[in-house]
């Protein structure tokens, strides 16, 4: 009569809580690099699925923190599949993270997630968002015109990387492997692109049934990790 879902417990809250704890205290570059590596590898995995999945709402509130500061991407409420070269047209996501092509309703693809990666990196590095506005129209205008509010003390390597990601033209944005190959990541992570795993390469999960000796206990289906 019942269906039980056994879900992972991620006990350290989300990245937003980490940033907002003390805005005067910056996160270390090492921590930023490793948190972003986890998010980027998750996005890469989604984009390599068949068909590809775009998340469309990557932001600090949607990145959970597990023990050891392992970042886990969550909340797929705005996600969707990509079919062939067809672009999506739904205006969705959180305004301060919207890519220009979503604002302009010209159609969008996986590159909207790359844009959000740049926004997230900016926020982790500075504690602020790159595009400001007292109202939604001013915000949209600043995004369209690429009016980025750069802090004077931002790490030069991070600024260089963000500048390569936050491009108005989606085709001009660097790819996910290029992001992880940037000097900012290679400085703090050994061979960061090794974490880019495709669905075909990942260890597979197979369901199996667990039961007890008590006939009154319902069987439980668990997704067990097995190597093909």
Residue ranges and their predicted role:
Residues 126-129:
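Structural helix C-cap motif within protein kinase domains
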Residues 50-65:
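Catalytic-loop of the protein kinase fold
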Residues 2-14:
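Conserved short submotifs of the Hanks-type protein kinase catalytic core
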Residues 177, 181-228:
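C-terminal regulatory tails of eukaryotic serine/threonine kinases
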Residues 35-36:
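Activation segment signature within eukaryotic-like protein kinase domains
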Residues 16-26:
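AlphaC helix of the protein kinase catalytic domain
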